[in-house]
């Protein structure tokens, strides 16, 4: 299942316009000080498709809010009110959000650890990811008006 999601994600991301991206765009790196918004912590800057930072932000916020698709629609509408997305960019965003990033991260952590057993904490994290999967897919289907 996760391999299929990853394959679809790669297809959607294939044609990307690349720019310098923050690389770790989340709520912790956006500050409001002296009446202005500031973006901080550029340690993970990378040259990548432009949609990477938007997708990272939407993913992080959505995970923290149980993949509430109404909030996802509001985030996307707000973003597009200042920076309209092409159909290609929307497909790229879909691809990034469809990619099973959390599952992949935990599996990679286990694989790289060279342990003969799966740590209890990793099993707990996998259980949480699997429990949220239906909400994540519903979020994607409703925000992008597709069926997976």
Where are these regions (language model features)?
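Active-site catalytic-loop/activation-segment of kinase and kinase-like phosphoryl-transfer enzymes
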Residues: 1-11
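Gram-positive cell-envelope targeting signals
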Residues: 2, 37-39, 58
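Active-site acidic catalytic loop and adjacent metal/ATP-binding pocket
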Residues: 10-52
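Active-site activation/catalytic loop segments of kinase-like enzymes and analogous catalytic loops
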Residues: 51-84, 97-115
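Helix N-cap / loop-to-helix initiation motif
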Residues: 85-89
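ATP/Mg2+ or Mg2+-diphosphate-binding catalytic cores
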Residues: 104-148
